[in-house]
């Protein structure tokens, strides 16, 4: 069952991944209209120019009947509807989703994102440019600028932590594909509190292949608890920076390979950056510090992810191919260094786009004797609705 990974295979994978990312990042998605340079019809009468309506004027004209001039929403009794309009002044709600999702619902109607049919389509009444103006006005209803905008909630990589504070449940599996097989599953619960903060719990459960080929499992690993704080965010620059402090408790069995035998402190910074053409960059760097030094080594790690999100169908599911670069070094003199690469792709599964899957493969670059791992997760953004909603 032993397998080697020649360097030329790794180089070929890297070249293919970089070529794919570069193609999606630097090629334009629009095609100029063939009639763009043709002269229009001539007229002898002087044109009359009027100022285009503002976002506020468009909102009051097209949206305020249901959503209210103040953005708080008109009562369902007054409207005769079953679904209450959202409160745009509630920053906890209004800040989370990017403009693109709001415009999709307004342009195509509620069902395009798995919401009520009572939200009509405005595609015949308002252009996408006018909807963007309306969105700019809707953003003024949340007056607390402490809340990071939803555009900064970049796709979650398989290993690198996100900088954006979220409400998510993630079930992930890491499968050793070589030698004696092993599977480590993690159930991750994340809950946001306040504008910038998040608490996280990680429950790992492991399975291992024995020498005789039989499997044993259900072993508890080292449980982790962490708190994240967004230190800086700026929608204009497309940047977000966070700090997380995580504690790994020695709940796993060290002899079975599912625990470290000591409490481990793991502080780290995470950074997210929106790039042109739907691309993005995410970086994480931090330290691992075992409380009992005899049971572990101090380690520094860095992780970087480059990817791009796109929609083959303008209003359909989102595809996000990514490649992660993962490095770690022990801090003692003459310590070990490890570098891995992990190509992967995240896909939204339902129309509401709050349930996602990510599949990837982690490949050792510096040492072919280390095992490769198949990695996969299912992510549920539970703030946006139940797991079975929006399909």
Regions picked out by a protein language model, each given a short descriptive name:
Residues 55, 59-70, 119, 134-138:
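The canonical Cys-X-X-Cys-His
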Residues 62, 129, 135-149:
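Aromatic- and Gly/Pro-enriched helix-to-coil junctions and flexible linker segments
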Residues 14-25:
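Bacterial N-terminal signal peptides
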Residues 49, 56, 68-104, 155, ...:
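Gly/Gly-Pro-rich "capping" loops immediately C-terminal to redox-active cysteine motifs
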Residues 129, 145-391:
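Transmembrane beta-barrel domains of Gram-negative outer membranes and organellar outer membranes
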Residues 80-139:
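Extracytoplasmic electron-transfer domains, predominantly the class I c-type cytochrome c fold
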């Amino acid at each position: 069952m032993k397998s080697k990974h020649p360097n030329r295979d790794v180089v070929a994978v890297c070249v293919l991944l970089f070529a794919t990312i570069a193609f999606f990042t630097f090629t334009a998605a629009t095609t100029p209209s063939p009639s763009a340079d043709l002269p229009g019809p001539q007229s002898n009468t002087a044109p009359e120019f009027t100022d285009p309506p503002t976002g506020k004027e468009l909102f009051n004209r097209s949206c305020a009947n249901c959503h209210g001039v103040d953005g708080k929403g008109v009562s369902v009794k007054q409207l005769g509807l079953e679904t209450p309009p959202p409160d745009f002044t509630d920053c906890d709600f209004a800040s989370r989703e990017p403009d693109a999702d709001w415009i999709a619902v307004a342009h195509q109607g509620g069902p395009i994102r798995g919401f009520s049919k009572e939200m009509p389509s405005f595609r015949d009444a308002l252009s996408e440019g006018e909807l963007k103006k309306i969105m700019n006005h809707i953003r003024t209803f949340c007056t607390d600028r402490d809340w990071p905008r939803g555009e900064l909630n970049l796709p979650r990589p398989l290993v690198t932590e996100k900088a954006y504070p979220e409400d998510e449940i993630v079930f992930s599996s890491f499968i050793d594909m070589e030698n004696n097989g092993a599977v480590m599953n993690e159930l991750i619960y994340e809950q946001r509190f306040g504008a910038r903060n998040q608490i996280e719990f990680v429950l790992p459960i492991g399975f291992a292949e024995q020498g005789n080929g039989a499997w044993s499992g259900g072993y508890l690993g080292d449980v982790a608890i962490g708190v994240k704080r967004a230190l800086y965010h700026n929608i204009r620059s497309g940047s977000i920076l966070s700090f997380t402090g995580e504690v790994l408790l020695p709940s796993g069995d060290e002899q079975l390979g599912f625990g470290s035998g000591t409490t481990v402190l793991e502080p780290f910074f995470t950074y997210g950056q929106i790039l042109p053409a739907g691309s993005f960059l995410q970086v994480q760097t931090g330290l691992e510090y075992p409380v009992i030094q005899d049971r572990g080594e101090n380690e520094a790690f860095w992780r970087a992810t480059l990817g791009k999100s796109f929609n083959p169908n303008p209003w359909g599911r989102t595809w996000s191919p990514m490649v992660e670069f993962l490095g770690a070094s022990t801090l003692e003199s003459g310590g070990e260094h490890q570098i891995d690469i992990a190509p992967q792709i995240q896909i939204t599964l339902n129309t509401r786009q709050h349930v996602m899957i990510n599949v990837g493969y982690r490949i050792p670059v510096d040492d072919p004797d280390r095992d490769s791992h198949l990695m996969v997760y299912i992510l549920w953004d539970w703030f946006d609705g139940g797991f079975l909603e929006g399909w």
